[in-house]
Amino acid sequence: MSLSPKQVQLFEQASKHIPGGVNSPVRAFNGVGGTPVFIKKAQGAYLWDEDDKRYVDYVGSWGPMILGHAHPDIIQAVQTAAVDGLSFGAPTVHETTLADIICDIMPSIEMVRMTNSGTEATMTAIRLARGYTGRDKIVKFEGCYHGHSDSLLVKAGSGLLTLGEGEPTSKGVPVDFAKHTLTLPYNNIEALKECFAKFGHEIAGVIVEPVAGNMNLVTPIDGFLQAIRDVCDEYGSVFIIDEVMTGFRVALGGAQSVYQVKPDLTTLGKIIGAGLPVGAFGGKREIMECIAPLGGVYQAGTLSGNPLAMRAGITMFKHLREPDFYSKLEAKLQKLLTGLQAAANEAGIAFKTQQVGGMFGLYFTDQEDITSFDSMLACDTDAFKKFFHGMLERGVNLAPSAFEAGFISSAHSDEDIELTIQAAKETFAEMK
């Protein structure tokens, strides 16, 4: 999409003092090409850019805007909280209330600690697993993103022969950190078992996205998550489910309720604060009691449990716990994806969609199943780039990467869905 001179000027100005002109790399449009659009405001299912062009939004600030942008109840909660003070650096009753809600909704969480971000949550969960077990090694899976802490910015070599000799995927991460992270193919149960047969008594924990939302959207095959549960039980390792993206998005009880698996620890993201900066990790009481001040595993944060995020989150959960909230959300998304698939079929374009709750994936491929990072890499990313820009031109905002999931909110209307399907029909016609 060609941008106005104003938008180009804004990006040039931003690039003078902000590296790459953005404060998070995916916003730079490197995955789709072109210059990022600067957003001025948001309301409900819509964004408006600095030229006052409106977009139907399927990014939702990368997931947390499940009620839509600027929901009046959330805005009221934040405004009321702000009048009482922005941050105290002391306990508040609102932290306890939100913790009670989370523990009530997710039975695997017996105790929970608030953090400032999902990265802080996963970083501390890894530290906690190591402190609890007295071991160093962590298992993660290809294509799963768990924040930008050093221990998790790692990619191991292919095959079991190179396990334990991982290399960082970011400069600035010491190789000594990488050697403790073992990376396995997602959905590969045999590789998991072989890894534990070789290193099991050295493995502190396994961390996994139950639905991988950072390689588009890849769901777990039957038995995969349970296999992780089983080997962790067998070897005394900590099973960590990263629900930063899926928590309260795919179902009220998160992906762990959808796939009926119980982790030892769970990490959560900014959805618990209705989109404000916040995260959390929680799980078994005996493990959580290893965290300071009760135990020797240190974690702290001046803004952890900040009152604005706590009160926004408490208000949001009142809506999420309403009867049929998630069934209505899923029905909306199913209608959208059915329409997109029909439009692609009519245009003769190899295209596939996938849905879990309110999350979705779009793939330009004729593959029957997308079950791994390799199968995702085999999709046509050039076709996605064309589709992205065609949709953006027509007022539909998708994630600017073929490797990111999309999200729908309760604010999306039938008219928004019809507009999106029509935009796709026109874009597919251009792509023939």
From Swiss-Prot:
Provide a GO biological process annotation.
protoporphyrinogen IX biosynthetic process
Keyword ATP-binding in the entry? The reply is no
Its keywords, alphabetically, are: Cytoplasm, Isomerase, Porphyrin biosynthesis, Pyridoxal phosphate
Q: Which InterPro entries match?
A: 4pyrrol_synth_GluAld_NH2Trfase, Aminotrans_3, Aminotrans_3_PPA_site, PyrdxlP-dep_Trfase, PyrdxlP-dep_Trfase_major, PyrdxlP-dep_Trfase_small
Which compartments does it reside in? Cytoplasm
What GO CC terms are in its UniProt record?
Answer: cytoplasm
Q: How does it assemble?
A: Homodimer.
Please identify the protein, giving its name as recorded: Glutamate-1-semialdehyde 2,1-aminomutase
Question: Species name for this entry?
Answer: Acinetobacter baylyi (strain ATCC 33305 / BD413 / ADP1)
- The gene that this protein is the product of is hemL
